[in-house]
Amino acid sequence: MFEEEIKIYETVLAEYRQKISQRMNGDELKEYNEILFSAHSCGIEGNSFSVDDTRELKEKGLGLIPQGKTLYEAFEILGHFKAYEFLLGKKEEPLTEELLKETHRILMEHTLPYKCPGAVPGEYTDTDMCAGDTIFGEHETLIARVPQLLDSTQQAISEGRVHPMVLAARFHGFFEYLHPFRDGNGRIGRLFSNFILHKAGHPIV
């Protein structure tokens, strides 16, 4: 299953390593990936920061917010920087609820209380969730399945029998279905699917 997709991925991966990763030192590549990934992941959720805006924020912090951008958007990007650095620094650690919740806490610390008063960064939702036209199931039932998803994914990582890209995509799909947090599920799902790739020595996508 997915043999053709894996072949295409491996071809693109080889080209990426030849044209991009081998032409940068470790620190340059890390910052390049962090800026691109943070800009695009937050952009999917409606953040208007461009890649250049995100790079400027990374270099200058809150001392200079690009014209036309909000402080809330800046805190979203800064939170993503922190969560990205925290999670990818845990490469040797297994997938656990503790790691999941702490990453969410770091990501949403300065934005969730403003967007969803009463919601606690790092804690699961206490209400049923919806996103756009999608209505998710009963939240307690879905949240109860999170440990199983983490355990089965960690087991697959340890056994090494599933291609990392397939495993990352599978995790992302199931995690978004469970939608366990009040906000930030998309960003957390993308962070952890890339964490799976990172653990296998693959680049951030």
For each predicted feature, which ranges?
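FIC/Doc superfamily catalytic core
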Residues: M1-V205
